[in-house]
């Protein structure tokens, strides 16, 4: 049983507020939650907080805070599951979950909350069941068009004919508009991996972890069967080995409850009949043993003149992907000593950009080709008490507050574990001659890629 549900933007602005029981302090509770959240040290806040007999449970999704409050002794895990399911429902009915889509679909969100929760008690979170009661149509930012070849979104892929699913393709609502009779039968399948790495200052690898998911978003009628074929050499655990080549191994794996595993052991095929909407077909984890080299290596060189406070940082970034692969939206973030205000730079290519932002050096590289090497020379003044006279720059100990460096990036058509989708086959038979469209994409991106200086 919950008392309130509200959605806040990343800046704390209330987008949605619903009081189910009238036993709380009104909308001020949302402001109280955000003040407590921002007042905590560090970036990671607890998902469960307590204040004057009221429990706050929240998740963060797409930059939004989804929060429930309760004064009862309710399992926090059940409320976290409810919030996760609400996030999926909002994505299904609004097309995607973000500040813009929520603002455009306030009436639809409140109608969903009225059907999902009655006086704070959960009634249903089934997309299929709710579609019989929801009357409000979603307001989308722009109509979907195959001629929209903008940047590829989360559920999009490059096909063999070099056609690209537009970014809005999978961001439309699962339920078609009543006036739209041309709803396309489409399936979007993404293999998404998050890479966490910690590299010591001498270049040795201290930690590596891959968290992977196979995500599905289906616009087919519910009950349509599909078969997903994974790499045949895929194995779970170190003791299992399949095929004659090097195995693609993960440490742990879990499946959605709707997945039929009858063909998994013999042929690495997943069978399922998904409902309309989004679900995670499979999750897996791999630690400490990647089958391929790390995508990036950083070679830093720091020279600091204590007398004048002159700091020179030379960064050489090497991309160890295959030459046909590339990394997109690469950003290096390097914390600097306190008080640095000036920056001079020499970059190896004009596409790069570097600037000071919030006490750190931010080096942006829009696109990095596999096998390439980029560099940047950065000079700055570190204010502080004068030191003994020095004859030029030296490679002495770095000033306090420098580093560690962190990288963020996206690797399209690449998985760090080596897992691939061999095929996606549908048993769906459309009424007309149009066959369902299938889009498959593989993507890796950084989660915490840290290099000590």
From Swiss-Prot:
Positions of transmembrane segments: none
CDD domains reported in the protein's UniProt record: AP-4_Mu4_Cterm, AP4_Mu_N
GO cellular component terms, semicolon-separated: AP-4 adaptor complex; clathrin adaptor complex; cytoplasmic vesicle; cytosol; early endosome; endosome lumen; extracellular exosome; trans-Golgi network
Top-level taxon in the UniProt lineage: Eukaryota
Cysteines engaged in disulfide bonds, as pairs: none
GO molecular function: protein domain specific binding; protein transmembrane transporter activity
SUPFAM superfamilies xref list: Second domain of Mu2 adaptin subunit (ap50) of ap2 adaptor, SNARE-like
GO process annotations (BP): autophagosome assembly; Golgi to endosome transport; Golgi to lysosome transport; intracellular protein transport; post-Golgi vesicle-mediated transport; protein localization; protein localization to basolateral plasma membrane; protein targeting
Keyword Transport: yes
Bilayer topology term: Peripheral membrane protein
Disease: Spastic paraplegia 50, autosomal recessive: A form of spastic paraplegia, a neurodegenerative disorder characterized by a slow, gradual, progressive weakness and spasticity of the lower limbs. Rate of progression and the severity of symptoms are quite variable. Initial symptoms may include difficulty with balance, weakness and stiffness in the legs, muscle spasms, and dragging the toes when walking. In some forms of the disorder, bladder symptoms (such as incontinence) may appear, or the weakness and stiffness may spread to other parts of the body.
Protein name: AP-4 complex subunit mu-1
UniProt gene name: AP4M1
């Amino acid at each position: 049983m919950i008392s309130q549900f509200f959605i806040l933007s990343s800046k704390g602005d209330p987008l949605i507020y619903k009081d189910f029981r009238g036993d709380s302090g009104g909308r001020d509770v949302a402001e109280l939650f955000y003040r407590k959240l921002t007042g905590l040290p560090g970036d990671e806040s607890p998902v469960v907080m307590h204040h004057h007999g009221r429990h706050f449970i929240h998740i963060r999704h797409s930059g939004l805070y989804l929060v429930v409050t309760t004064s009862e002794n309710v399992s926090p895990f059940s409320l976290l599951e409810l919030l996760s399911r609400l996030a999926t429902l909002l994505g299904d009915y609004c097309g995607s979950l973000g500040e813009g889509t929520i603002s455009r679909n306030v009436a639809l969100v409140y109608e969903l909350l009225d059907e999902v929760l009655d006086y704070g008690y959960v009634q249903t979170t089934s997309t299929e069941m709710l579609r019989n009661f929801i009357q409000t149509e979603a307001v989308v930012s722009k109509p979907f068009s195959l001629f929209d070849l903008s940047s590829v979104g989360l559920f999009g892929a490059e096909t063999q004919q070099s056609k690209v699913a537009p970014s809005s393709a999978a961001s439309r609502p699962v339920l078609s508009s009543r006036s739209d009779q041309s709803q396309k039968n489409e399936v979007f399948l993404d293999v998404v991996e998050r890479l966490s790495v910690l590299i010591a200052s001498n270049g040795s690898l201290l930690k590596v972890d891959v968290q992977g998911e196979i995500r599905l978003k289906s616009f087919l009628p519910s009950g349509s069967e599909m078969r997903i074929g994974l790499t045949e050499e895929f194995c779970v655990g170190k003791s299992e080995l399949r095929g004659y080549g090097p195995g693609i191994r993960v440490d742990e794996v879990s499946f959605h409850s709707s997945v039929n595993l009858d063909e998994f052991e013999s042929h690495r095929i997943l069978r399922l009949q998904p409902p309309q909407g989004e679900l995670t077909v499979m999750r897996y984890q791999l630690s400490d043993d990647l089958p391929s080299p790390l995508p990036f290596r950083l070679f830093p060189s720091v020279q600091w003149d204590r007398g004048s406070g002159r700091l020179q940082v030379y960064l050489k970034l090497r991309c160890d992907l295959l030459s046909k692969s590339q990394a997109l939206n690469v950003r290096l973030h390097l914390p600097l000593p306190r008080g640095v205000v000036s920056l001079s730079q020499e970059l190896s290519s004009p596409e790069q950009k570097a600037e000071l932002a919030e006490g750190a050096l931010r080096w942006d590289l829009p696109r990095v080709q596999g096998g390439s090497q980029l560099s940047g020379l950065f000079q700055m003044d570190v204010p502080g008490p004068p030191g003994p006279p020095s004859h030029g720059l030296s490679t002495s100990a770095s000033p306090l507050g420098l580093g560690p460096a962190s990288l963020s990036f996206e690797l399209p058509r690449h998985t760090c574990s080596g897992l691939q989708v061999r095929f996606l086959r549908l048993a769906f038979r459309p009424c007309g001659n149009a066959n369902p469209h299938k889009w498959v994409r593989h993507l890796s991106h950084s989660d915490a890629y840290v290099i000590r200086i």
